[in-house]
Amino acid sequence: MAKKRIVVMYGGKADEHSISCISAASALRALDTDKFEAIPVGITKDGKWIVNGENPLGWSLDEGLPTVEKTPGAKDVVLEVALGQDGFFAREDDGTMTPFGHVDAVFPVLHGPYGEDGTIQGLFEMMGVPYVGCGVLASAACMDKHYTKVLLAAAGIPVAPGITLDARSFDKASEFKTDADAIMAQVSEAGLQYPLFVKPSRAGSSFGVTKVEHEGDAAELAAAVYEASRHDWRILVEQGIDAREIECAVLCPKAGEAPQASWPGEIVLDKRAEGDDQFYDFDSKYMDAAASHVEVPANLPEETLNLVRETAKKAFVAVDGAGLSRVDTFVTKDGKVMVNEINTMPGFTSISMYPKAWEATGVRYTDLITKLIEGVLR
């Protein structure tokens, strides 16, 4: 049987560019090469699609954070939308076009805006090209934490208390210092309890997230809102929840099938090298191996673990999920579960929760990739 030709995409214009590269490298190494022929396609930070660039198989977190560059020998990728699955070409130096051949599916291992937000999913929908992952609606809604909460709340799924701010009306020149009292008034009116977490609505990997600990400190709050605004003008201010953060991997390779949920896992934060405890920020996730470790299943009663699994599946269905997602939840001391956010293209690095959770549930990394791809093949 002929191998299926799969375009694996990585990089992109988002802040998560390098993590996407590492995720794709891990996925490519795990790909069943007896079944699939992979064509790696990178997207540079300025949005250029290239093929035959640097080989991503050599990338790992141990070597730092890679970026997609147009190296000598790399070719621009050109799409002919009307040709659908036969519409992928590499532009040669003399301007001629070399076809990829029939592309059976695309695996967009892209995180953040322009990759995980419904835009590229819409492109492949227009081309009629099968792709791994959530569709346009779920991708767009889950990229925006505000609208994720709107959908979940409408489905009766508990979410953290919070408010949403529009930073476009704030004074950027003063770094929002002149808006500090007005921002504080909105938080006070909502009755939010400290600590607060201020985060961009449409960013991932903890970019722009700040913990605000001092109640009544308008300057600290305004500074946190300004930091978040560097990534997005829509900003969430959420009440900190006295709970454990438990993550659950959801898998639904074929449209219309019931989603499956892994054993829930927990990122256990360890002391940082400098001796400080802190929340799970970008450095804790990717740059400091001593900052945390993963436990799957999480050390919780089985009844609570099953409640997390059921909540994750309900959340996945509520946003019209497809393919895969990682549902992040809060579990309180009395066993209540609320959803924090949904990642429609979770990390696939060697330390990422999604593949680790499925491995602990009995699905090997290679089999996981195979299930995801075969689920969308025609």
From Swiss-Prot:
It comes from the Bacteria. It is found in: Cytoplasm. Pathway: Cell wall biogenesis; peptidoglycan biosynthesis. One of its GO terms (molecular function) is metal ion binding. Mg(2+) 2 binds at E341, N343. ATP binds at residues 189-247. Pfam families: Dala_Dala_lig_C, Dala_Dala_lig_N. Mg(2+) 1 binds at D328, E341. Binds 2 magnesium or manganese ions per subunit. Its EC number is 6.3.2.4. One of its GO terms (biological process) is cell wall organization. InterPro entries: ATP-grasp (IPR011761), ATP_grasp_subdomain_1 (IPR013815), D-Ala_lig_Van_CS (IPR000291), D_ala_D_ala (IPR005905), Dala_Dala_lig_C (IPR011095), Dala_Dala_lig_N (IPR011127), PreATP-grasp_dom_sf (IPR016185). Keywords: ATP-binding, Cell shape, Cell wall biogenesis/degradation, Cytoplasm, Ligase, Magnesium, Manganese, Metal-binding, Nucleotide-binding, Peptidoglycan synthesis. It is an enzyme of class 6 (ligase). GO terms for cellular component: cytosol. Gene3D superfamilies: 3.40.50.20, ATP-grasp fold, A domain, ATP-grasp fold, B domain. The keyword Magnesium applies. It catalyses: 2 D-alanine + ATP = D-alanyl-D-alanine + ADP + phosphate + H(+). Residues 149-374 form the ATP-grasp domain. The keyword ATP-binding applies. Cell wall formation. PANTHER family: D-ALANINE--D-ALANINE LIGASE, D-ALANINE--D-ALANINE LIGASE A. Belongs to the D-alanine--D-alanine ligase family. This is D-alanine--D-alanine ligase. It comes from Bifidobacterium adolescentis (strain ATCC 15703 / DSM 20083 / NCTC 11814 / E194a).
